Amino acid sequence: MFDFEYQLKIIPEKPGVYLMKNSLGEVIYVGKAKVLKNRVRQYFQNSKNHGSKVRAMVKNIAEFEYIITDSEMEALILECNLIKKYRPRYNILLKDDKHYPFLKITTNEDFPRIFVTRVRAKDGARYLGPYPETSAVYETIELIKKIFPLRTCRLNIKENGEPVKPCLNYHIKLCTAPCAGYISREEYGKTIKKIIDLLNGKDNEVINDLKIKMEKASSELKFEEAASFRDKLLAVEKIRERQKIISSNFENEDFINMYSEEIDLCAQIFFVRDGKIMGREHFILDRSIFGNNADIISNFIKDFYGGTAFIPKTIYVPEVMDIELLENWLSSKKGSKVSIKIPQKGEKKKILDLVESNAKNTLEQFKLKLKVDKELYSNTLKELQNILELEEIPNRIEAYDISNIQGVDSVGSMIVFDKGKPKNSDYRRFKIKTVKGANDYDSMREILTRRFTHGLEEIKEIQKRNLLLSGAKFSVFPDLILMDGGKGQVNIALEVLEKLNINIPVCGMVKDDKHKTRGLVYNNKEINIKSNNKIMQFITRVQDEVHRFAITYHRSLRNRRVLHSVLEDIPNIGEKRRKELLQKFGSVENIKKASYDELLDTNSINQKAAKSIIDYFNNAK
């Protein structure tokens, strides 16, 4: 039994990190402290001053442990790492690590390419961004392709390299074919410079050049050509619209503010890159486990920048705790000075007010949608309960499906709807192991047996404390099982559950002549439901989702089997090396033609691997 009184007495008066655990041994909260003794003792004293969430957390604490560090900065870094590792329930948790996309221009190549990447490497290439809106990045690339002819292939093209036959893009004027030697490195480089200038807001030269060409084509009665230049001008205008300048200092800055109502809070962040608002992001949080606004923003900064690939030069906030400590931590992560500022007036204060206004609007919309969705899903599930005469509302529904093509690569899928909404984290996939050929009944029997056997085993392990609840994949059972098939599949499910001594209601779908669901079968009774009924719409949604999930998995298995690369047969060439070779040379044929020195020029290829490649292709001749 954990002795709280004794443990609180012996905590050292040093900086460090503390971990709160529940009765299952799960880490439910991670915190840092300048003085561990003072901070940890606060949780178990003056509970009236705590928020409701803190009181709930303290009730769940069965034990705690701590790690002493040499400094508060060390404690902050360790706290961030442990929060990432354990994802504790009572910490502010944003989405998974945010790796926003960059536009990468491979200026380290003779003939650069432009594409989207989420990894910023020190490889000599030019990176623009990051951009918070992924769709906007891809749209920007498409617009650039309309304006400038660029190569999109992965060939390793050198200025005086051996020419190859140009691809279709050259013939439809989307590429200038540097692979065939049709353009010099210098001329191609001028195009790249124009692209970089355009993306940096220096678009006057590009616009003037296009206008001159359009007017010239028009005066020569080349109307199609003139229309092409007009379309390019419109594309430039679209790129320009995405880059509204709101600051004259052309620096990278983030603006963070929030708005809260009772326990609900929306934190909003505006991203300013080179003086232009490039996007925004919001996070809906529960503020009740933290203190004042300054404490919340401090935790938000640690959470957000602990998981993002880019940190701006300046971050503006309305208030914050531990400002000097956070600045030092961010500066060490970035490798250069980062400032956190609290503007009281002027342009920066106006932007912060704008961020708060957006946060308020976002929170109001979120709460309204939540209310509408909750009522809709709750009413639908209650109606489903009444139609099937279930004892409980089916808050958790599991649906199953089998997918195969002519008996090959049979797979089973399980999806979960929790309180009317898909719960993707609980989706599971099963590769059929014991059934040969296309036998949906036996395949369904196999996956249901595996699913519920695993569940029973996990429950035993959790009870023995050999397994944490968070580490279990099958221990939560559904309130209702929904089978895509009719009576046959329902009977298979009931047979499996009976053998395992599990009591869960099972219903199936009744199809019409066109294979469309027209109702449900439950307890050997068919229940017809009108197509415009909310229940039928919900069932159709579940059915579509389980089909989508099953087919996606089946397709991935099939592709993995069909797309077997010859590189997989070469000794000393693993997945990482295969990937890098294909990125560098573009195709197996080009790898086959590569010289020993060219192979060695690939990052992960050493002398032994290069020799294996040469020997393999020589022996294959």
From Swiss-Prot:
DNA repair found in the keyword field: yes
Compartment(s) where it occurs, according to its Swiss-Prot or TrEMBL record: Cytoplasm
GO cellular component, one term: excinuclease repair complex
SUPFAM superfamilies given in the database record: C-terminal UvrC-binding domain of UvrB (SSF46600), GIY-YIG endonuclease (SSF82771), RuvA domain 2-like (SSF47781)
Domain GIY-YIG: 13-92
PROSITE patterns, per database record: GIY_YIG, UVR, UVRC
InterPro entries in the cross-refs: DisA/LigA_HHH, GIY-YIG_endonuc, GIY-YIG_endonuc_sf, GIY-YIG_UvrC_Cho, RuvA_2-like, UVR_dom, UVR_dom_sf, UvrABC_protein_C
Main location: cytoplasm
GO biological process: nucleotide-excision repair; SOS response
Record keyword Repeat present: no
CDD domains per record: GIY-YIG_UvrC_Cho
Keywords: Cytoplasm, DNA damage, DNA excision, DNA repair, Excision nuclease, SOS response
A GO MF label: excinuclease ABC activity
Ranges of residues in domain UVR: 204-239
Family according to the record: Belongs to the UvrC family.
Function, as annotated: The UvrABC repair system catalyzes the recognition and processing of DNA lesions. UvrC both incises the 5' and 3' sides of the lesion. The N-terminal half is responsible for the 3' incision and the C-terminal half is responsible for the 5' incision.
Subunit-structure text: Interacts with UvrB in an incision complex.
Full protein name: UvrABC system protein C
Species: Clostridium novyi (strain NT)
